[in-house]
Amino acid sequence: MPRRPRVLIPGVPLHLIQRGNNRSVCFFTDEDYLFYLELLDEQASKNECDIHAWCLMTNHVHLLVSPHNANSASLLMKGVGQRYVQYINRTYSRSGSLWEGRFRSCLVESERYLLCCYRYIEMNPVRAKMVNHPAEYRWSSYRVNAQSERSHTVTPHAQYLALGGQGGQPADAYRELFKNDLESELVDQIRDATNGNNVFGGSEFAVDVEEKIGRRVQRGSPGRPKKSII
């Protein structure tokens, strides 16, 4: 069965995941993580992608981006992926593939669903039982989004900025979101949407996407998430 084509629309947030080949380790030292982040910053600027959230796990990568152009996300992942493989092969005297293949992705509805995806990404190390709290994990954007740590890589999305209200601090309100776990149903919906290259959002969002791309899409969520989870 042919793989479902990616759904990519300029300006619409996209959750991306890139896995190591056979789920093998992709990052071996702190220097590897730092080099990947340097590439991410460089290629995001070059290919016009806003990075809103990220998490580098030992054997896969999560990104939440808003591409400015139809091919921005693909060029971003190609630019980062190829150069990182070259770096790893050179550094560790190895050869061959590092990544599983094509990255997987899903479009994310900004209104009411985007912050769920932020949390999903930055809670990965906690779900993997690597740490007890996302602030303890160095290789994610949590400290940027929740603790106002400086970053050249992260561009805040309008939905994130709106958490601050009139003159408030988005980071303060953002931290409050992590006092409650993301519902397991939503975790499954995000995973299903991403692995299937579908959409994570409501019915109206799915219809709007279908009109833009001229084909049917499947949603990763059967309805609107509850107010309490965002």
Task: Name each model feature, range by range.
Residues M1-A53, M57, S66-I230:
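Short Pro-Cys-Gly-centered "Cys-loop" motif that presents a nucleophilic cysteine in a tight turn
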Residues H60:
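Glycine/serine-rich anion-binding loops at beta->alpha junctions
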